[in-house]
UniProtKB/Swiss-Prot annotation:
One of its GO terms (molecular function) is 4-hydroxybenzoate polyprenyltransferase activity. GO terms for cellular component: plasma membrane. NCBIfam families: ubiA_proteo (TIGR01474). InterPro entries: HB_polyprenyltransferase-like, Prenyltransferase, UbiA_prenyltransferase, UbiA_sf. Keywords: Cell inner membrane, Cell membrane, Magnesium, Membrane, Transferase, Transmembrane, Transmembrane helix, Ubiquinone biosynthesis. It is an enzyme of class 2 (transferase). It is found in: Cell inner membrane. Its EC number is 2.5.1.39. Catalyzes the prenylation of para-hydroxybenzoate (PHB) with an all-trans polyprenyl group. Mediates the second step in the final reaction sequence of ubiquinone-8 (UQ-8) biosynthesis, which is the condensation of the polyisoprenoid side chain with PHB, generating the first membrane-bound Q intermediate 3-octaprenyl-4-hydroxybenzoate. It comes from Acinetobacter baylyi (strain ATCC 33305 / BD413 / ADP1). This is 4-hydroxybenzoate octaprenyltransferase. Pathway: Cofactor biosynthesis; ubiquinone biosynthesis.
Length: 290
C-alpha cells in the first residue's frame, strides 16, 4: 500500500473512533445524564456536565479503537465492517493501540476535576472497555459485557456528584444493562450469518430462534427497573410514566420491524434506540422542572 498523507491518516483516525457515527456516543451519553440529573437532584453543576460529557466521548472513542484492533482479522470478512481503517490496512494495528492509549489518557486527565472515588471507579470502566472486544471469541455473552461497560458511567456520575451509588443508581444500572443487551442483540442479528462463518460469538447466536422474544423481555425488564428507580426518587408521576409509555410504544414498534429478522430492519431498530435514552432523559428533566 502506498504511503498516505497526514490528512488521510487523520481521516482514518476519525473513522476509527466512529466520530462519523455518533449513535454509540448517544447510547452512553443519555443514561449518564439520567444518573447525573438524579444524583444532582435536577441541578447538576456545569463543570460536572462538561466533564462527564467529554468522558463519554473519549471513552466511547477509545472503545471503538480497541474494538477494531481486536476485530482487525475478521472485519474484512463482514460486509458491514470491511471498510474500517484497520480492515483495509490504511492504518496499522499499533496505531489503533496508540489512539486507544491517547484517548484513555485524555479521559484520565478529566478525573483531575472529579472526586477521588470517581478515580477508583474509573478502573472498572477501563477494564470493561478493554476486555469487551475480546469476549466475542470466548463467550456468547459479549453483549452483557458491553452492557456493563455502557452502564458504568451511571455509578461514576453518582460518585462525581459526591453521592454513594444507592438503590436508585443500581436500578438504573441494571435497567440500562438490560436495554443495552437488547439493542446490541438487534445489532448482532445483522451480522449473524457472517459471525457463524468466522466463529464470532454473540447473544444473537445464543438466543437463536428465541432472539426476538428475549429482546422484548429485556426491553420490558429495562422499563420496570428504570420505572422503579424513578418511583423511588418521586419522579414517576406523571412525567416518568409518560416517558416510559412512549418508550414502550417505541419498543412495540421495533418489534413490528424486527419480528421477521430482516438484517436491515434489525439494524434500523438498533439505531432507533438513540431516541429511547433521550425520551427517558426528557421525562426526568420534566419531572424535576414541573
Amino acid at each position: 500500500m502506498q504511503p498516505i498523507s497526514w490528512r488521510e491518516r487523520l481521516q482514518a483516525y476519525y473513522y476509527l473512533c466512529r466520530f462519523d457515527k455518533p449513535i454509540g456516543t448517544e447510547l452512553v451519553f443519555w443514561p449518564t445524564m439520567w444518573a447525573l440529573w438524579i444524583a444532582s437532584d435536577g441541578y447538576p453543576d456545569l463543570k460536572m456536565f462538561v466533564v462527564m460529557t467529554l468522558g463519554v466521548l473519549f471513552m466511547r472513542a477509545a472503545g471503538c479503537a480497541i474494538n477494531d484492533f481486536a476485530d482487525r482479522k475478521v472485519d474484512g470478512h463482514v460486509a458491514r465492517t470491511k471498510q474500517r481503517p484497520l480492515a483495509t490496512g490504511i492504518i496499522r494495528p499499533i496505531e489503533a493501540i496508540w489512539v486507544f492509549l491517547a484517548l484513555v489518557a485524555a479521559s484520565a486527565a478529566l478525573l483531575l476535576f472529579l472526586p477521588i472515588e470517581t478515580f477508583y471507579w474509573s478502573f472498572g470502566a477501563l477494564f470493561l472497555a478493554f476486555i469487551y472486544p475480546f469476549m466475542k471469541r470466548y463467550t456468547h455473552l459479549p453483549q452483557v459485557f458491553l452492557g456493563a461497560a455502557f452502564s458504568w458511567a451511571i455509578p461514576m456520575a453518582y460518585t462525581a456528584t459526591g453521592q454513594a451509588p444507592d438503590l436508585t443508581c443500581w436500578l438504573l444500572y441494571f435497567g440500562n444493562l438490560a436495554w443495552t443487551v437488547a439493542y446490541d442483540t438487534q445489532y448482532a442479528i445483522t451480522d449473524r450469518e457472517y459471525d457463524l462463518k468466522i466463529g464470532v460469538k454473540s447473544t444473537a447466536i445464543l438466543f437463536n430462534r428465541f432472539d426476538i422474544p428475549i429482546i422484548s423481555t429485556l426491553q420490558l425488564s429495562s422499563l420496570l427497573l428504570i420505572g422503579m428507580a424513578l418511583y423511588i426518587e418521586n419522579l414517576l408521576f406523571p412525567w416518568g410514566i409518560i416517558g416510559l409509555v412512549v418508550v414502550a410504544v417505541d419498543f412495540i414498534y421495533q418489534w413490528t420491524k424486527t419480528k421477521n429478522r430482516d438484517p436491515q430492519l434489525c439494524f434500523w431498530a438498533f439505531r432507533h434506540n438513540r431516541w429511547v435514552g433521550l425520551i427517558i432523559f426528557l421525562a426526568i428533566l420534566a419531572a424535576f422542572r414541573f
